[in-house]
From Swiss-Prot:
It is an enzyme of class 3 (hydrolase). This is Translation factor GUF1, mitochondrial. It is a peripheral membrane protein. InterPro entries: EF-4, EFG_III/V, EFG_V-like, G_TR_CS, LepA_C_sf, LepA_CTD, LepA_IV, P-loop_NTPase. It catalyses: GTP + H2O = GDP + phosphate + H(+). GTP binds at residues 69-76, 133-137, 187-190. One of its GO terms (molecular function) is GTP binding. Keywords: GTP-binding, Hydrolase, Membrane, Mitochondrion, Mitochondrion inner membrane, Nucleotide-binding, Protein biosynthesis, Transit peptide. The gene is GUF1. It comes from Paracoccidioides brasiliensis (strain Pb03). GO terms for cellular component: mitochondrial inner membrane; mitochondrial matrix. Its EC number is 3.6.5.-.
């Protein structure tokens, strides 16, 4: 008890005494109440060894380069080996480090261009290398062309066993047009089927590249890869820029982070940018405070400054919340310098060429589907989005893509990353309608295509898009490929042999035929040895019509398609027979028809369930028999007139599936 009283007295006296603090100097900052965090707090962090090394490297020892090639020629694997050689990642067990999406790793393709900065010591001096791993497929050509803006050269990669392919040719001309220094590289020389001499001859004949400058490597085993980095240093030019001039910063790409908002991948042409700088967009006029700058090494690694010639990332504080504000190709500068600089040439906006409709399998999942699509759109603004509604399938979306692979990858990401259960309609292409009053209209939704009466009365001309397709394949399959192209309404433009056994064939084809599994048919005709690339070739007048599916004379709005008149009969018969398989029998007759306007081109009938009304009759009662059968017939007519055909969602899902 006595101890408790002593404790209480001590606490009471301590509470009554005035607090004593150490004297504060007037010059000393107050430690107790300074809770504000300056915007440039990042610049006060201790400087790392990495940052010291980068700061000591002048711009003439910067090298910005990318790897371009046909799909599946080993770009991502070669990137892994280069990152290991420069010590950016630890060797062993690395597989496509720069392919960050699940769908990229699953399919073994690059969808999104990825970047990484490397430090390389060559002859006693540090070099700052910036690598871009680009997609190889034609659908992601926009990613490739944007990557070239941040590069001074490119490694042109060719598979030693396959040789020059269609997209090798296309990527070469893209890089050549940008003025990039090209270094030929032959990959996969370790394969038993490798023929590097043939590949070198093809590169010399097709691109006029000197075979003596080529480097022969195996990215998988690492054979000879160490020779690539000295070649990059010696052959690829340094970027041009001046860090003392006003800031000129090109937005190359962007992606969305839940915590940091929109993150920008930028190339600094002049000047420098730090955390805390106040910058503005020349395209939108919006202004932002820089929250952090850094490089990809290989993940996001913060730095105190990005200088002229560097490629890195920045994000803002407060964050940029709307990805629409980040216009790829935009120029940024410091606030107050807007009139001192000229905007950098931007990029051509990619146009959607393939359209599909997407509906949730369960109508109640529409909000979840909308949420999932919007999240994916934050990182891929080349997709167009428009809400639409179908009587058969309910609320959904009309989505526009750069190509069929682009569409397929998006669908896979919806299913894998967001668990979406969706119904996707077959891909369609846009069509142009020229009206009699001179107006032109692009139709992307078959349901909005003019009906037959309007076509006759108000339309002057219908046009469809064509593409110039470049096909490369062994000479032995030439006859089959020409036959395939001709059957798909193609027109031959050129034919050349770039080796004794390899052919480059160019055809103008309707885009509608190309998206209708043309590549699959091409692979089948050539046992998988053909490759395909294409570019837009403009619009052409065409005889096209809207094919509709009718169930008991009522159009099914979810199933309509604009096709060439030569395909109407064949496709109509396929439709009605396939749809019949998935529609359940009703109490009345169901008639399935394919029609163009009022013209019925194909028909199938689903017989009704039949009740035996004669079961209790005497065999000789002919009059009564006839009377009951007539009554049943009249009842079915009435039921057919007032009854609705019930078509389950799974029927549409099965019908629309490939």
């Amino acid at each position: 008890m006595r101890g408790c009283l002593q404790t209480v007295r001590w606490l009471t006296s301590a509470w009554q005494r005035p607090p004593s603090y150490p004297p504060l100097s007037r010059a000393a900052p107050c430690r107790f109440f300074n809770v504000s965090i300056p915007r440039n707090a990042q610049s006060r962090k201790p400087v790392s060894d990495l940052e010291r090394r980068i700061a000591a490297i002048p711009i003439d020892r910067f090298r910005n380069f990318c790897i371009v090639a046909h799909v599946d020629h080993g770009k991502s694997t070669l990137s892994d080996r280069l990152l290991e050689l420069t010590g950016t990642i630890q060797p062993g067990g690395n597989k496509q480090v720069l392919d960050k999406l699940d769908v990229e790793r699953e399919r073994g393709i690059t969808v999104k261009a990825q970047t990484c900065t490397m430090l390389y010591n060559y002859r006693g001096e540090d070099y700052l290398l910036h690598l871009v791993d680009t997609p190889g497929h034609v659908d992601f050509r926009a990613e490739v062309s944007r990557s070239y803006a941040s590069c001074g050269g490119a490694l042109l990669l060719v598979d030693a066993s396959q040789g020059v392919q269609a997209q090798t040719v296309a990527n070469f001309y893209l890089a050549f047009a940008e003025g990039l220094k090209l270094v030929p590289v032959i990959n996969k020389v370790d394969l038993p089927s490798a023929d590097p001499v043939r590949a070198l001859d093809q590169m010399a004949n097709t691109f006029e590249l000197d075979p003596k400058t080529a480097v022969l490597v195996s990215a998988k085993t690492g054979l000879n890869v160490e020779q690539l980095l000295p070649t990059v240093v010696e052959q690829i030019p340094a970027p041009v820029g001046d860090h003392t001039k006003p800031l000129r910063m090109l937005l190359v790409d962007s992606w969305y982070s839940t915590y940091k908002g929109v993150i920008l991948l930028v190339r600094i042409f002049d000047g420098e940018v730090r955390a805390g700088d106040h910058v503005g967009s020349l395209a939108t006029g919006l202004k932002y405070h820089v929250g952090e700058v850094g490089i990809m090494y290989p993940g996001q690694t913060a730095q105190s400054v990005l200088r002229a010639g560097q490629v890195g990332y920045i994000y803002f504080n407060p964050a940029m919340k709307r990805s629409q504000e980040a216009k790829v190709g935009d120029t940024y500068t410091k606030v107050g310098s807007e009139k001192l600089i000229e905007p950098l040439p931007g990029f051509e906006e990619p146009k959607s060429m393939v359209f599909v409709a997407a509906y949730p399998v369960d109508a109640s999942d529409f909000p979840h589907l909308e949420d999932s699509i919007n999240q994916l759109l934050l990182n891929d603004r080349s997709i167009t989005l428009q809400k639409e509604s179908s009587e058969a399938l309910g609320a959904g979306f009309r989505l526009g893509f750069l190509g069929t692979l682009h569409c397929s990858v998006f669908e896979d990401r919806l299913r894998q990353e967001h668990g979406a259960s969706i119904i996707i309609t077959p891909p369609t292409v846009p069509f142009k309608v020229i009206w009699k009053d001179g107006k032109e209209e692009i139709i992307t939704n078959p349901a909005l295509f003019p009906e037959e009466d309007a076509l006759r009365a108000k339309v002057v001309e219908l046009q469809e898009p064509f593409v110039l397709a470049t096909l490369t394949f062994p000479e032995e399959y030439l006859g089959r490929v020409i036959e395939l192209c001709e059957s798909n309404r193609g027109e031959q433009k050129s034919l050349e042999f770039f080796t004794a056994t390899q052919v480059i064939l160019k055809y103008e084809l309707p885009l509608a035929q190309l998206v209708d599994d043309f590549f699959g048919k091409l692979k089948g005709s050539t046992k998988g040895y053909a490759s395909l690339d294409y570019e837009e070739s403009g619009w052409r007048r065409s005889s096209i019509a809207k094919l509709q599916l009718l169930v008991n004379k009522v159009p099914v709005d979810a199933v309509s398609r604009v096709v060439h008149s030569s395909q109407v009969q064949k496709l109509g018969r396929v439709w009605v027979s396939k749809f019949k398989e998935h529609v359940d029998r009703q109490m009345f007759e169901v008639v399935i028809q394919a029609a163009v306007g009022r013209n019925i081109v194909a028909r199938e009938t689903i017989k009704p369930f039949r009740k035996d009304v004669l079961q209790k009759l005497h065999a000789a009662d002919v009059t009564r028999r006839r009377k009951l059968l007539e009554k049943q017939k009249e009842g079915r007519k009435k039921l057919k007139a007032v009854g609705n055909v019930v078509i389950e969602h799974k029927a549409f899902q099965a019908f629309l599936a490939k």
